[in-house]
Amino acid sequence: MNDWSIDDARAGYNVTHWSQGFYGISDHGEVTVSPDPKNPDYKIGLNELAKDMVKAGVALPVLVRFPQILHHRVNSLCQAFDQAIQKYEYQADYLLVYPIKVNQQQTVVEEILASQASKEVPQLGLEAGSKPELMAVLAMAQKASSVIVCNGYKDNEYIRLALIGEKLGHKVYIVLEKLSELKMVLAESKRLGVTPRLGLRARLAFQGKGKWQASGGEKSKFGLSAAQILLVVEQLKQNDMLDSLQLLHFHLGSQIANIRDIRQGVSEAGRFYCELRALGASVNCFDVGGGLAVDYDGTRSQSNNSMNYGLTEYANNIVNVLTDICNEYEQPMPRIISESGRYLTAHHAVLITDVIGTEAYQPEDIQPPAEESPQLLHNMWHSWSELSGRADQRALIEIYHDSQSDLQEAHSLFALGQLSLAERAWAEQANLRVCHEVQGLLSAKNRYHRPIIDELNEKLADKFFVNFSLFQSLPDAWGIDQVFPVLPLSGLDKAPERRAVMLDITCDSDGIVDQYVDGQGIETTLPVPAWSADSPYLIGFFLVGAYQEILGDMHNLFGDTNSAVVRIEDNGVTNIESVLAGDTVADVLRYVNLDAVAFMRTYEELVNLHIAEDERAQILEELQVGLKGYTYLEDFS
């Protein structure tokens, strides 16, 4: 493909659309990051960055964070709502609340809070969904607006801690998820002498579409029905505490792809708000929860991995709908709160790692079968001969299907003992030659050929064995078929000669990335430059900043990866600010209650029993280094 250009690479991997301008491909074919929107010309080459870290002793895989992206996401979201409020003459403000469940890493939370340090009135709060998260936000919320939203199921201790937050100077909204929580709040607030700020989560009838749609709707795990909301209002009235009810919350799901779903959800919740106001409740905050999507595949569509709207449209729709409803009911306009954690964090982190080996099909010449060979092999040779003579287009699919059928029969005959191992191997090679030849002759412009092209791309794809654990670093790719953009970090100035699939290093057949962004769609294989051990390239997994770290598990005892925080200074200099070491072997053993110290004593006993004296020190040192070492592969050259 002599006419290949960088623009082809950018379009082929759809970088321009899913990256939101933070990532790109340079004219030299290397993937870059532009983390500081104030200085868009300042770019970092990810390939060189990774090599510099390796030289400094940071082993791959490494998760690289770009905090300036977090700053930009916070401020762009606040700006979008500020502009919408001005456009529709909305009579209240907007507050962005970060739900730390999305990424609880200290660096992430602190950078999000620091993003508005220069603002006289920060538009930023924190959300907790459990007691550990609440303990964290109680210590951090004063760095922003001191607003804390408490979601999730609660016991008496959770409620006491939330009320203590009020004593510490925070504005803590305790959102009722169940009717029984109200009784606990009333009792604990009386005991502590604290007037609570109450919220309630409404269980909407409307249910948005998407992977997380069970978060909404009448069968939702969370929230109060209309009847239960009326009971809350009545009990608060009886206790002369109706003015404590200050916040209405609802949640459609974590990734709402269709803007119409958002409008419909806000419309229904807006009616709840106005009805509560009419009943005498002092509700002044309208919490739309999460739902602001991330366009993982860059298609700007209604697919589960995308979104059919932009940030401005999102803010405009919420503000517009709520303005109209409040005007219709002649109710005051409430402060708008959103909990847009996925939007804030997804783009800021990239996992970079190396390929430890590849397995690729290379066409081999095949000789005709011996005359006494089973007729099946002669049939397969005939199919191959037809292709060698350049069969017409109509015959290609028939020849391909015949070859697949013959291969299945060959496997059956081998299992019955009617085909030797050598004959089976010949049949498999003949089938691969047919597949390879057919692949080169089919045309994507022919709609009848497209399904076969997809099959062959998958069948003949190279296998890249990549130094990472899918279950640790991309758990949503395994658990819910989430798509994450994957790119070689260099060599993109040349046309991709191969297609590949990425396999992790766990001992699990599920450890494979089976969906890839390819142009304006999703494919089961990834176009890649030709691989060479003499000039290898690194692989980047993008948009992994939301949920992946905390959801990741230790399958095969592969632990947390190394991580680094990287920033571009005002003078354009790249600064690796901090490096956090990943788990050692001893660390992950400790997680499952295995004692590395006791293991070392056992090793010493075994070494003294079985190893010659002149080798003992070397063997013990190797074992000790193994316990202190990285859980990922470091020595495979």
UniProtKB/Swiss-Prot annotation:
Pathway: Amine and polyamine biosynthesis; agmatine biosynthesis; agmatine from L-arginine: step 1/1
GO molecular function: arginine decarboxylase activity; metal ion binding
Tagged with keyword Lyase: yes
Enzyme Commission code(s) on record: 4.1.1.19
Keyword terms of this UniProt record: Decarboxylase, Lyase, Magnesium, Metal-binding, Polyamine biosynthesis, Pyridoxal phosphate, Spermidine biosynthesis
Catalysed conversion reaction: L-arginine + H(+) = agmatine + CO2
Enzyme class: lyase
Biological processes per GO annotation: arginine catabolic process; putrescine biosynthetic process from arginine; spermidine biosynthetic process
Binding site for substrate: F286, D287, V288, G289, G290, G291, L292, A293, V294, D295, Y296
Entries under Gene3D superfamilies matching the protein: 1.10.287.3440, 1.20.58.930, Alanine racemase, Lyase, Ornithine Decarboxylase, Chain A, domain 1
Residues bearing the modification N6-(pyridoxal phosphate)lysine: K101
InterPro entries named in the record: Ala_racemase/Decarboxylase_C (IPR009006), Arg_decarb_HB (IPR040634), Arg_decarbox_C (IPR041128), Arg_decrbxlase (IPR002985), De-COase2_N (IPR022644), Orn/DAP/Arg_de-COase (IPR000183), PLP-binding_barrel (IPR029066)
Entry cofactors: Mg(2+); pyridoxal 5'-phosphate
Function: Catalyzes the biosynthesis of agmatine from arginine.
Entries under HAMAP family matching the protein: SpeA
Family per similarity comment: Belongs to the Orn/Lys/Arg decarboxylase class-II family. SpeA subfamily.
Name by which UniProt lists this protein: Biosynthetic arginine decarboxylase
Classification of source organism: Bacteria, Pseudomonadati, Pseudomonadota, Gammaproteobacteria, Alteromonadales
